[in-house]
């Protein structure tokens, strides 16, 4: 049976050997070039392929149409993936009539995603395993073909568990590959309600937080012990690595991170104490704990910290351009709730941020980004993270003032992007769900969905195209110049301070603000083209929490990523939004101050937005990247968001007149 294989690491090598032993004909193998920054303790798939006389390739993007066509020419009957690190597109999966199968290092549906070997140890699991499953478009979500359980012993570390999993995988493949070859397999659908998903781990994720329990820290040490990069901590600014440890039943009132003794080297934790059995100072040699204490100059009562002492003292400086806007003011509030951010902001007004103006860690200048270019360049250079949130983002303006939209949304933001490249600053750029345009996918996916817009004579697309081109420019700067970036795409965020009722009076606002104005003034709610267009509405608190996690960037997991931020469960048509808003309005304690409801009125989009408008029937996000990179899920129901947004705006209305 002809097969094409995607493979890497030891699992890739043993998978290839198992296929050959089972009589499969391997037409080609796709693998990765080794990362020079990664310790290569594992077997080489490329070398094995060469020794076996099998063509081997390591493309940067195997999902490129040229590679899809080459794989199609190989006519594989079945496809296998063994620890290949990139998601394989659906077009490739569909090339094999007998299907595609992936070997995953956990007991699916638990521990989908990256680095399951390390995550099970971090989380103190006592059992894991290997799973062979059918590949579908969603990562690690296909039906299970075979599983083998592996016990995790208390003394297992990453490398010993790795060897156990390799042994189990070899057994599983020996038993299962002949059955796949003869079409004699039983598939069991995964239970989605039991699924868990974990993201990529980097060396920076493995710092020891001494306020946690000794058992939790010991599990971290086990999870990343040699040949992985190791768990680490600091003495002042001196970094050291812990290679092995023991949980010590020592009851101490010492502060977490304090040295209890140096022989053995015992460190107080949030609960219990951790004995450092072996470790390494800086780039030195491995030594036993008491010698490490001597090398680091530790004595009883010394304090360890999770980050360098100098880093712990300096706040992260965040520059927010458009700080008075809907996202900017809510994000400022979230950042200032923490004690490690300094926020610098620029905007043409300050009404939404007036509550922060006296905050010691908030610095505001009133001004226009098209005028204050020197101030902006200076602060890009000064700050650590830049969020250029200035944009015209109201649909009526796309047809009313398309050139102004282009000048502000594209030209001014391009200048800021180039400052970030020049001074090597991290940029978190607000893309938009509008870039997907008229995409027909059920879920809009950051990495695979096509971005489809209308003809040139429909100026409503100038916003979408301006944002899309900036996305592509930022991506290219990341690839070619090393720009550190994250693109985030908000899907219909709603909440207090979304536009204002005065903006709604001239039509320059988002949907819910316009609908609230209609209720306040007693004018008919206008349903553009019947209001059947569906959107997924997201509470501003959910959106800001995701954006905050992008800024935090744990383990640099957000670098180079595009992340949809939306709530696919909160899908509703504009008509349904209007009905929900009306029901909330009728129950509101201030209802009697406002005129009677004037009804719904259907209007054509051309009469409301102008002749250059086109609408989109649906816009539902895939949030797999948000789950993977941010460990984030939206939580707030749409009705709660509507109630709070309505309440906020009703309480801004002058109610000096008598009730109606």
Swiss-Prot record:
Pathway given for this chain reads: Nucleotide-sugar biosynthesis; UDP-4-deoxy-4-formamido-beta-L-arabinose biosynthesis; UDP-4-deoxy-4-formamido-beta-L-arabinose from UDP-alpha-D-glucuronate: step 1/3; Nucleotide-sugar biosynthesis; UDP-4-deoxy-4-formamido-beta-L-arabinose biosynthesis; UDP-4-deoxy-4-formamido-beta-L-arabinose from UDP-alpha-D-glucuronate: step 3/3; Bacterial outer membrane biogenesis; lipopolysaccharide biosynthesis
In terms of Gene3D superfamilies, this protein maps to:
3.40.50.12230, NAD(P)-binding Rossmann-like Domain
The answer, when asked if Cell cycle is one of the entry's keywords, is: no
Q: Name one Pfam family in it.
A: Formyl_trans_N
| Binding residues annotated for NAD(+), in chain numbering | 347, 368-369
Stretches the record annotates as Dehydrogenase ArnADH:
314-660
Where, by residue number, does UDP-alpha-D-glucuronate bind?
A: 393, 398, 432-433, 460, 492, 526-535, 613
Q: Where is this site: Transition state stabilizer?
A: 102
Question: Catalyzes what?
Answer: UDP-alpha-D-glucuronate + NAD(+) = UDP-beta-L-threo-pentopyranos-4-ulose + CO2 + NADH; UDP-4-amino-4-deoxy-beta-L-arabinose + (6R)-10-formyltetrahydrofolate = UDP-4-deoxy-4-formamido-beta-L-arabinose + (6S)-5,6,7,8-tetrahydrofolate + H(+)
Which GO biological process entries does UniProt record here?
Answer: lipid A biosynthetic process; lipopolysaccharide biosynthetic process; response to antibiotic
Which residues are recorded as binding (6R)-10-formyltetrahydrofolate? Answer: 86-88, 114, 136-140
Which residues are the active-site ones? 104, 434, 619
Q: How does it assemble?
A: Homohexamer, formed by a dimer of trimers.
What's the stated role of this polypeptide?
Bifunctional enzyme that catalyzes the oxidative decarboxylation of UDP-glucuronic acid (UDP-GlcUA) to UDP-4-keto-arabinose (UDP-Ara4O) and the addition of a formyl group to UDP-4-amino-4-deoxy-L-arabinose (UDP-L-Ara4N) to form UDP-L-4-formamido-arabinose (UDP-L-Ara4FN). The modified arabinose is attached to lipid A and is required for resistance to polymyxin and cationic antimicrobial peptides.
The protein's name: Bifunctional polymyxin resistance protein ArnA
From which source organism is this entry?
Escherichia coli O6:K15:H31 (strain 536 / UPEC)
List the top taxonomic levels of the source: Bacteria, Pseudomonadati, Pseudomonadota, Gammaproteobacteria, Enterobacterales
